[in-house]
Each structure stands twice: as structure tokens, then as C-alpha cells.
């Protein structure tokens, strides 16, 4: 049957199918995009919890940088605690290779006693123990090479440990990737690098630096 031109242009049969074909890709992109970005925010929050846990372990554990043991101790006079830190004081920056081997460098403008390291101390902060969760507990996709731990002179003191250096400890996660799942197929999104995450704490009961 041949349909006249006027009737053809007024015919709306099949319009719903056309509208669905237009709307469904947009709807699916929005819906699955919410899932992907929700998972990204979940990983972001997990990363922040990981650096908080790492900073807490670092401030109560033996330092990774062995040279910290040789640094100037907290002033014996409590009135001197909190005064300005002299130039060229210590700043140990510890990172791990892709294989997980830790090494430390001296921060720009700082003076460090030596750059010997404790692999066990780094592994404890990263992995934790049976009784204490480490960074990996909160972010299972984390790699050792993405963790940076810095011990820097602060001029602060810790009242219950007057004979040991009290560094400012900063634990960071850098270059941690996020892989899109749904949007990788829909829009070609690949892997992105998440912004750096860090947590800073003042050293407390670092037992290897404590002298009764």
C-alpha cells in the first residue's frame, strides 16, 4: 500500500522507538557515570583513610630513616620548645621503588646525618600487622611505589619524650591510578591519576629514638 505524502508526515507510529533510541544512550551514560564516579570517590576516601592510618603508625613506630636517630634532640629547656627551626635542619623523604625497596633522600636545603633505611619499618607502615591495620588495609590497590613518607624538623617537642627528636611526619599517596569501568566503553575514558593525598602528624612515641 502506498501512503500519500501528507499522511506520511503526520504518521507518528514508531515515534516512541526513535525517542528511546535517542534517550537511552544519554540515560545509560548518566547512570553508569554515577556508578564510576561514585567508585572514584570511594577510592578517594579510602586513600585518605590510608594516609591517616599511615601517619598514625609512623608517629608511634621506629623511623624508616635511620639518620633520624642522630639528629639534634628536643630542647632540654621546655621554654625553648616551639621556637623557630634553624635553617638547614633535617628533612628525610622516603619512597619505594617499583619492586618495593625503600630509599630515603634529603630534602632541598636540608642537612641529613645519613640516608640508611629500615625496610621493616616501611613495610609495617604500609602493610600493618595482625593487630594494627596498615595503609594497604584501607586501599587494597595501593602500591609501595605510590607511598611517600617525610620526616621533617618542626621545632616542636613531645612532653613525655624530652630526649628524642620530634619530627613532623607527612605520609602521602602519589600517582595512584583510577581505571574507569563503564565510561571506558561508552566514552573511551581510560586511566586517570588521582590527586595526591596526604596526612601530617607530629612524631610521638618513636621508640627507637626514645631515651629514658
Predicted segments with their positions:
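N-terminal leader/signal peptides at the extreme start of proteins
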Residues: 1-13
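Short, conserved structural patches
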Residues: 2-3, 52-212
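Short N-terminal micro-motifs specific to bacterial/archaeal maturation
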Residues: 5-8, 38, 190
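Membrane-interface junctions
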Residues: 11, 20-23, 40
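Alpha-helical hydrophobic helix detector
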Residues: 16, 21-35
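Short amphipathic alpha-helical interface segments enriched in basic and hydrophobic/aromatic residues
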Residues: 32-35, 39-40, 55-59
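Membrane-proximal amphipathic alpha-helices
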Residues: 39-48, 61-64
Amino acid at each position: 500500500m502506498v501512503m500519500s505524502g501528507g499522511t506520511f508526515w503526520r504518521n507518528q507510529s514508531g515515534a516512541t522507538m526513535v525517542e528511546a533510541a535517542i534517550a537511552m544512550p544519554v540515560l545509560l551514560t548518566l547512570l553508569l557515570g554515577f556508578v564510576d564516579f561514585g567508585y572514584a570517590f570511594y577510592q578517594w576516601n579510602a586513600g585518605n583513610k590510608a594516609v591517616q592510618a599511615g601517619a598514625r603508625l609512623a608517629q608511634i613506630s621506629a623511623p624508616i630513616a635511620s639518620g633520624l636517630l642522630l639528629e639534634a634532640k628536643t630542647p632540654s629547656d621546655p621554654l625553648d620548645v616551639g621556637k623557630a627551626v634553624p635553617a638547614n635542619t633535617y628533612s628525610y623523604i622516603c619512597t619505594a621503588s617499583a619492586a618495593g625497596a625503600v630509599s630515603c633522600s634529603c630534602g632541598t636545603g636540608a642537612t641529613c646525618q645519613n640516608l640508611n633505611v629500615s625496610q621493616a619499618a616501611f613495610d609495617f607502615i604500609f602493610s600493618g600487622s595482625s593487630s594494627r591495620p596498615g595503609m594497604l588495609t584501607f586501599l587494597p590497590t595501593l602500591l609501595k611505589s605510590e607511598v611517600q613518607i617525610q620526616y621533617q624538623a618542626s621545632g616542636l617537642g613531645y612532653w613525655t619524650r624530652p630526649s628524642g627528636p620530634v619530627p613532623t611526619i607527612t605520609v602521602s599517596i602519589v600517582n595512584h591510578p583510577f581505571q574507569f569501568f563503564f565510561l571506558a566503553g561508552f566514552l573511551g575514558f581510560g586511566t586517570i591519576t588521582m590527586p595526591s593525598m596526604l596526612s601530617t602528624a607530629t612524631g610521638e612515641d618513636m621508640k627507637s629514638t626514645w631515651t629514658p
